[in-house]
Structures are given as structure tokens and as C-alpha cells.
């Protein structure tokens, strides 16, 4: 147990904080969530290294630095309601909860949704509702959302998600073509949307009605 705590602290210090992530809430969340419980057992020893790892079904858990950056761009606060598109392992949702948010997370692959539920339960993470459906269509039942986080590559920002963003809310997503995307943040001000871009990234595809029609 002590070694895992040390690994997490080293991960935050050298992979995240040293590379410019400063939000105290995000740093504490990254220190507190046991990432090794969200990766397959064969990769548990690599859980705190700064690279993505496979979780099955051609999906991955993002590298810790990218998780921290996307969370900082979203800047979740205590009491926020966050919509996550692409649950994956459940790790990103756990980080959002550790920041004080409640999360609705949508995953399109049933086996991956089940994996995330098991991982979240094993890690003792509550305040996450995992749904299995097309996340590009949003989830109007609980809208509007203080933040929306898309954890897969989208060719454009899905219109339903923009509509479900609360006034003052932020949407963070990798937007671009099949080879490379730009990490993008959109902030809503009533009926206007302010867009900022934060550099190149590469993610697995966002499949759905308002995403890519098929994987590549």
C-alpha cells in the first residue's frame, strides 16, 4: 500500500505538476485515486507510468498527464454536475468525483461500461452513473451540465452536447481528423460559445450519430 502511495505521489510530482498542471483540486484528485485499480492486472505495475494502457475492446486508459490536463481545463468544482462521454476504464470519472463533482458517464461498448462499473466499485467511488448508449446524442434528462468532457476523438463538437452545456459551463474534447486532434475547450456564455485550443493529442475515435460513423 505504501509503495502505491509513493508511486502516485511521484506520478503527480514529476509527470503532472512539473509539466505545468497547477490546480490544487486536480493535483489532490490525482494523488488520491488509485489508478492501478483501473488498469488490467497484467499492466498494474505500469499503472503510474506516463503512457496510455490497453483496457480491452480496442480501448485505452489515457496517460495520467492528459487526464490531469483535461481535468484542469474543465476545472470542476464541488457540487458540479459533469457529463462524460466515453467512460473507458472509469478512471477519468473517478478523478472528477475526487474533485467534488457528480458524474454521468456514457459508454457505447457494453463490456467496457461493465468494466468501468466494476472498477469504480472496487475503488469505492460513488456519485458516478454509468450509462451504455450513444453519448454523442447527449443526455437531456439531467441537463444542463456545468461541464462536459469528451474522452474520444471527434471530427466536430456534437450539437446536442453544446446545447446541454449550462451558461458558464465548459466542454473539453479532442477535435480533429483521424490522425491527430487538438485539445479544445468551449465555454458557453448564454447563446455564444468561446473556443480555445491547447495543442495536439491523439485519441481513439468517438463513434456515434454526431461523431465518426465507424472506427479506423
From Swiss-Prot:
Spans through the membrane: none
Keywords: Cytoplasm, Methyltransferase, S-adenosyl-L-methionine, Transferase
Keyword check for Methyltransferase: yes
Annotated family: Belongs to the methyltransferase superfamily. L-isoaspartyl/D-aspartyl protein methyltransferase family.
CDD domains from the UniProt entry: AdoMet_MTases
Record protein name field: Protein-L-isoaspartate O-methyltransferase
Subcellular location: Cytoplasm
Reactions that this protein is recorded to catalyse: [protein]-L-isoaspartate + S-adenosyl-L-methionine = [protein]-L-isoaspartate alpha-methyl ester + S-adenosyl-L-homocysteine
Role: Catalyzes the methyl esterification of L-isoaspartyl residues in peptides and proteins that result from spontaneous decomposition of normal L-aspartyl and L-asparaginyl residues. It plays a role in the repair and/or degradation of damaged proteins.
